[in-house]
Each structure stands twice: as C-alpha cells, then as structure tokens.
C-alpha cells in the first residue's frame, strides 16, 4: 500500500500476490503435485496460443506462478522420501529410539506458575533425524522432530549428536475452540512430529556433527551465548534479559511478568527483533561509514554485510529477513543513485521469504511485518505533506513537528494492524499509540549502545563498562515506562478474535480504498470499510442465536472445565482446574466462551477441592465477569490454602459466594432443570472425591449428569436412590475404573459417555465397563 501501488511500476507485486494465492489455495484445498504440473502445462499452451494478447498472456503467467506457489507449499507439507520420519508419525504414539543432530538451542522451561508440585521443568529443542531403530537394526531416516524432555538437562549444544528413547507422536491440532494449533505451528517450521522423553536417562550424547551447516549453526549459537554472557557481565540482573531479547532475540530470557508487561503496553514488538532493529542497525553502520569518509560502494557493502550478519544471528525470523532484503536492495542501488519502488522491494522480499518458508504466510510475525511496512510506506509521504517541515522553523518547532509526524505514522500503522493483532493475540493496546513515540528513540539508543557493548565489551572491558552504564539506565527507563503504561486504566483491551471472513473483507476493502484512482470509487470503498467495522462490532456483541442447550467439555489436560449454555443465553461453568498450567486453562475457558459470543459466566460451580478441579478459578475471576461462585460446604472443610484464598478473594473480583447442597435448583433458565444431586446437607465423606458435587441437567426430556470425581462413599449414597437412564454422562474421576464400576454403570445406563482428561488406556477400559456400542468421547 505504498505510493508505488498506484502506478504500474511494481510488477513484482502481482507476482508475489499470485504466489501467495497459490500457497493459500494449497493450504485450504491440498492437491498433489501432478495437478499443479498439469494445470501449468495447460496454461503454458494457452499462453503460447494467445501470447500476442497482453491481458490473456499476463493472466496465464500469473496463474502459472500461483501454481508454483501451490506446488512449493505442497512440497513443504509432503511426507517426503520413503525414509522420512513423517511417514512413521501416526495418531497413535509409539516408543522409538532415534539418533540425530540438535539444530536449535536446548531451552529449559520451569513449571508454570501454580502447577502441581510434581510438575518438572521441560527442556526442548529441534532434532534432525539421521537414523531410527526398527526391530533389531537402525534404518536411515530424514526430517525434523520437536524433542521434549520432562526434566532439566545440561551439557547439550547445537550440532551435538544424540541418541534418544521416547514416545513418538503427532502434534495435536487445536484442542479447544479458538485454541492454539500446535501441529500447524510446528509444520510451518518443517517439524513433523514430537518425541517425548520421560527422563534424562533417555538422552545420550554420542558426539557432534562435522557437517558444515551444523558447524555453522553451532558457531552462531556459541556467538549468541557469548553475547549473552557479555550483557550479563555489564548490565544489572533486571535489564540483562531485556537487552538479550532486544539485541540477540533471546526472548526466553524474559520472565512471564516482563513479557506480559510489554504485551499489555503495546511495546512487545520493540523487544522482538524485527525490521525496526535491522533499520536502526543499518542507519548506525551507514552513519559510521559516512563519518569515516567511505565511498558509496564501500558504505553499501558495509551495510549489506552488517545487516545480513545480524539476520543470521537473529535466526532469519520473517520480519528480519524481510527487512534485510529491503535494506540490501536499497543499499545496492545507492552507488548508482537508483531507488527501487517500495512495493517492488516489498514484493521481492515476500517472494524470497515464501520461497524459503512458504508456511510463513500463516505466521503472525510475517503477516504483521509486511502489513506494518505497507502501512508505513503508504502513510509516510502523506504525513509529510500534511505536516511539512520548514527550514525557517525553530529547533523546538521542528522537534514538535517530527514527533507529530512519527505519531501520525504510528497511528496509521496501529489502525491497520489492530484487527490482525486482535485476531492472533486477542488483545488491542491503545496505550501503545502514546508510548511508542517515547520508546522508539530510547530503544534506538539502547540498540546502538548494545552494539558497542557486544562489539567491544569482550575485548575492551573498559569500553564495555562505559557503554554498559548508559545502556543499563536506558533499559531501566524502558522498563519503568512499560510498567506504568501496562498498569494504566485503558492500557489494553482483551477482545475476541475477529473471524477470518471478516478479516478478509476488512483488508480487501482497505486495499481497494487505498489503491483506487477514482474518487467516487474510493469513497464507496471507504463507506464499505465503515460498514464492515460496524457489522464486525455488532456481530461480536450479538449473543448466540441457536436458542438451544449447548454443552462444551473443554480439554483441560488432567482436569475439568465444562461450559453449559442455556437457551436464554445464560451460562454455567462446571469446574475450572488442571494439574498443568492454570493460567493457560483460564484463558482457554475465556476464549471458548468468546467463541460462543459469551462475555460473562453467570455461575461457576466447583465440584470439590482438588486442584485439578478448581486451580484455574482464581485466574478466571480476574479474566472475565462471573456472577456467582458455587461450592458445597465440604469445599471449605478441606482446609486447602488455595481453596480458602479463592473464597476470600472472590468478592474482590465481583462474584458472590453461594453454598449448594443436594436438592438445590439453579435457576438459570426456566426451560432447563438444573438440580444438585450430591452432597446432601451434613455429609462428610472420607475424601474430597466422595464429597464431589453431582449436577443433573434436564432439557426437553434429555438428562445430563456432571459428576466431578464422585466415588467411594459418595457414589454409594447415590446408588442407594432409584436410578434413571442418563443421556449424557460425564464419567466420574476422569474415567478411572474405580469410579466406573458395574453398579454405577447399571445405575446410570448412559447413551453417551464423556471423559475429561484420563489416561491413554481410559477409553479401552471404559468400553469394557459400559455396554457394547456406547460412544465414549475423550478430551485427550
């Protein structure tokens, strides 16, 4: 969307668009390579026949390019040669012994905050497979795997050869509405499977690879680690992780608190190495070269070498690769005083990026990077005309006008990228409009000082100290600005992700509006854009229109989260807990509710005081409005600190606390019967599980039974009452055989059995317990 978009001088723009369209078509409608080759041959014949008709010939060429994009995407997603590990990865996990080379730096993640005590750290890296053991001998294999070791492991580096024994499995797709698609994420990186190693004993280092590419990767990893050590030596513990993220792209050094602070202040992009950092580095090298009186050719060569080297250190992230290509094109044209069209340069960088990694078309980093640059290129010339600079102006006026120009350009970029940011991250940060104008100059100074620290701090400690002091102060100021910005009342708004169809409509109309040459058409597209915004807001605020009972059993790992939506739109959440990351589960629940266009939970009922049934409730109360928190009297009797804190803090979150016992009815919808069946008043079971709340839901002659972990004495008390058939049963205690014995099966006689969590053997054991033909659905 640059000024060049309005002229026919950007032929590569059409080429890049066609190539991207081909990738999109193949990702939506996969087709074999023969289809693309056959279509290309037919189009080639048509082009030859109509080569003297420019429009037909151009259309044929663009379609051939689109076929090339589809073919490139197909090749990147194909199973590969017969020895590819992708052919061995199936939906059923399998114990495997592999040998391969580590290609990414092993990173250790601590257990998530609030996780169970037995949770251990995990160490992750990507592995290039060389051999796999089949029966009694090893066979050659190719491909990449994501390795997850369920423990902390040290002494491994990029380029090391390792022998691994673990469980080979296929990455999962999105397990919940609006959830993260791990399979798609890994496939974009060329990873086709996951190897889970249970203990450190399943990992054995056997040497290191002498392959030139592996040795180069090892050298780059060592260079990044050496740079990180220099930063730690010259900066305070508070600012060193920020400097590592800013200068070396080591965002794993940031803790969750700092990461969330930068996200909520709308400044996270300043820490993620991107085109901004590449541009600042290029500007620094350019300035130094001019001060040294280098000629245009030498200056351009210095810029290109510096930028390309930095891109390699930054692991060729999409935004970095795009910026490196743009800077290289500009630098190569400078000695000849030739300036490439911005749209052409942007299209060329897109072609290079998609040719190397076609999956980056679906990457948020690549999408936001190209969109932001397009908005920058389109808005900058117009802002300069709107707020011109005058040579007669005073220094103060010049600074004010420069600041206003920067803010207006930032406003244009923010408005264009906000829908895409909301789609990927569920968040819009208006405070970034103000903060970025202050932060960019500080980040620029920090980057330049950081280059001095990294470049000379290892050889000349004195120079490192001289540059490290100001760098530490600037980064401390950046942290303070981000902290106060994130804590401001209107810093950020968490929002449901807009639909893909709405995004296509919005950006399609926006493209037509900025490229249209006719004023009337431009006005028409702008009106359409305004209508699209209004329709999007109304659709997001409109409640679900199906007017029926809707039950969603979310994947909570080993835990439970069941969302019930009544026909009148009111909602009930039964349980909110997991043995994994409770913060992640709380966000999963909110996202699932948002996907159903539900903005609040009218009631949250916690079955009992086991952490895998209530651990996410506290975070959930802070994420979305909750009307009532419902518990049984035995919940508080458990004496657990977390349970008591939850009930103490619930009023601060705006939720009322109510006790429920057997016989109570929840009045959410007059057409839905919701009755508590257990525990009765005064019941005191020997375990928390036996005290679990059991909820019966009736609607139009159908019955649903939500059971928590009911077993032992509590279950026997239920069995003493007359039983009636259940249409949908939530298997008690995550499908445990001890809670699903024959007496329980005969008492419930379910048509369907749902399992929240459970083990890999749960389904088979339940199929033996319940009558033949009973469908059993598991979240895991």
Specify the residue positions occupied by each region the protein language model found.
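Helix-loop-helix transmembrane hairpins and adjacent membrane-interface loops
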Residues: 1-85, 325-329, 394, 398, ...
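Membrane-embedded alpha-helical segments of integral membrane proteins
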Residues: 6-49, 363-366, 370, 465-515
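Hydrophobic alpha-helical segments of integral membrane proteins
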Residues: 212, 216-234, 242, 250, ...
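Well-ordered beta-strand positions enriched in small/hydrophobic/aromatic, beta-favoring residues
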Residues: 125-127, 195, 246, 352, ...
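Non-globular, low-confidence helical/coil segments that flank catalytic cores
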Residues: 151-154, 158-167, 184-186, 191, ...
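Hydrophobic alpha-helical transmembrane segments in multi-pass membrane proteins
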Residues: 14, 22, 55, 195, ...
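Hydrophobic alpha-helical transmembrane segments
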Residues: 7-13, 248-252, 314-320, 445-457
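Membrane-interface helix/helix-cap signal primarily in integral membrane proteins
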Residues: 2-6, 64-269, 584-591, 600, ...
């Amino acid at each position: 969307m640059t000024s060049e978009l309005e002229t026919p001088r950007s032929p590569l723009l059409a080429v890049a668009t066609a190539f991207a369209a081909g990738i999109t078509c193949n990702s939506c409608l996969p087709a074999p390579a023969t289809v693309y080759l056959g279509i290309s041959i037919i189009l080639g014949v048509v082009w030859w026949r109509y080569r003297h008709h420019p429009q037909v010939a151009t259309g044929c060429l663009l379609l051939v390019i689109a076929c090339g994009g589809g073919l490139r995407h197909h090749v990147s997603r194909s199973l590969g040669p017969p020895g590819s590990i992708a052919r061995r990865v199936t939906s059923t996990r399998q114990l495997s012994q592999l040998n391969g080379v580590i290609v990414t730096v092993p990173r250790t993640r601590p257990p998530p905050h609030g996780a169970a005590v037995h949770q251990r750290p995990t160490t992750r890296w990507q592995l290039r497979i060389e051999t796999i053991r089949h029966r009694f001998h090893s066979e050659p294999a190719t491909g990449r795997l994501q390795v997850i070791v369920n423990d902390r492991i040290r002494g491994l580096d990029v380029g090391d050869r390792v022998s691994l024994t673990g469980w080979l499995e296929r990455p999962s797709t999105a397990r919940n509405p609006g959830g993260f698609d791990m399979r798609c994420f890994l496939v974009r990186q060329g990873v086709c499977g996951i190897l889970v190693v249970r203990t450190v004993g399943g990992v054995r280092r056997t040497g290191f690879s002498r392959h030139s590419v592996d040795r180069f990767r090892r050298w780059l990893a060592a260079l990044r680690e050496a740079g990180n050590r220099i930063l730690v030596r010259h900066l305070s513990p508070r600012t060193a992780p920020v400097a590592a993220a800013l200068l070396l792209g080591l965002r794993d050094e940031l803790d969750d608190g700092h990461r969330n602070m930068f996200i909520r202040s709308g400044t996270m992009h300043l820490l993620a190495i991107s085109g901004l950092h590449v541009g600042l580095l290029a500007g620094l090298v350019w300035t130094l070269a001019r001060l040294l009186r280098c000629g245009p050719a030498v200056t351009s060569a210095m810029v290109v070498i510096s930028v390309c080297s930095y891109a390699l250190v930054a692991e060729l992230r999409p935004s970095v690769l795009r910026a490196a290509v743009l800077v290289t094109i500009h630098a190569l044209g400078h000695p000849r005083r030739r300036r490439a069209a911005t749209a052409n340069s942007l299209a060329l960088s897109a072609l290079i990026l998609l040719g190397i990694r076609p999956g980056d078309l679906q990457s948020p980093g690549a999408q936001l990077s190209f969109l932001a640059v397009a908005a920058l290129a389109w808005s900058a010339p117009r802002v300069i005309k709107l707020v011109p600079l005058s040579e007669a102006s005073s220094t103060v006026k010049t600074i004010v006008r420069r600041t206003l120009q920067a803010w207006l350009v930032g406003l244009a970029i923010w408005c264009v990228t906000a829908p895409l940011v909301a789609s990927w991250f569920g968040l819009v940060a208006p405070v970034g409009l103000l903060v970025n104008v202050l932060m960019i100059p500080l980040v620029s100074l920090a980057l330049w000082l950081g280059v001095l620290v990294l470049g000379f701090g290892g050889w000349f400690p004195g120079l490192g100290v001289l540059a490290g002091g100001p760098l530490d102060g600037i980064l401390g100021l950046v942290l303070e600005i981000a902290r106060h910005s994130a804590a401001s009342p209107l810093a950020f708004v968490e929002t449901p992700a807009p639909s893909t169809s709405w995004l296509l409509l919005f950006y399609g109309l926006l493209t037509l509006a900025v490229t249209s040459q006719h004023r009337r058409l431009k006005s028409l597209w702008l009106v359409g854009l305004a209508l699209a915004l209004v329709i999007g807001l109304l659709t997001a605020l409109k409640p679900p229109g199906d007017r029926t009972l809707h039950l969603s059993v979310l994947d909570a790992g080993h835990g439970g989260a069941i969302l019930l939506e009544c026909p009148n739109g009111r909602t009930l959440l039964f349980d909110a807990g997991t043995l994994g990351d409770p913060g992640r589960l709380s966000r999963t629940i909110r996202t699932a509710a948002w996907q159903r266009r539900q903005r609040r939970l009218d009631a949250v009922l916690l079955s009992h005081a086991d952490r895998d049934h209530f651990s996410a409730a506290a975070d959930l109360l802070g994420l979305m409005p909750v009307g009532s928190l419902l518990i049984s009297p035995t919940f508080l009797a458990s004496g657990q600190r977390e349970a008591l804190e939850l009930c103490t803090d619930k009023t601060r979150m705006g939720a009322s606390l109510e006790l429920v016992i057997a016989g109570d009815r929840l009045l959410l919808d007059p057409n839905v019967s919701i009755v508590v069946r257990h525990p009765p008043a005064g019941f005191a079971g020997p375990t928390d599980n036996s005290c679990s709340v059991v909820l019966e839901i009736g609607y139009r002659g159908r019955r649903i039974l939500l059971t928590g972990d009911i077993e032992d004495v509590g279950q026997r008390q239920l069995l003493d009452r007359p039983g009636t058939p259940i249409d949908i049963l939530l298997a008690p205690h995550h499908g445990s055989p001890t809670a699903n014995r024959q007496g329980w099966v005969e008492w419930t006689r379910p048509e369907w059995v749902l399992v929240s969590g459970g083990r890999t053997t749960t389904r088979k054991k339940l199929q033996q317990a319940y009558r033949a033909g009973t469908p059993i659905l598991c979240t895991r």
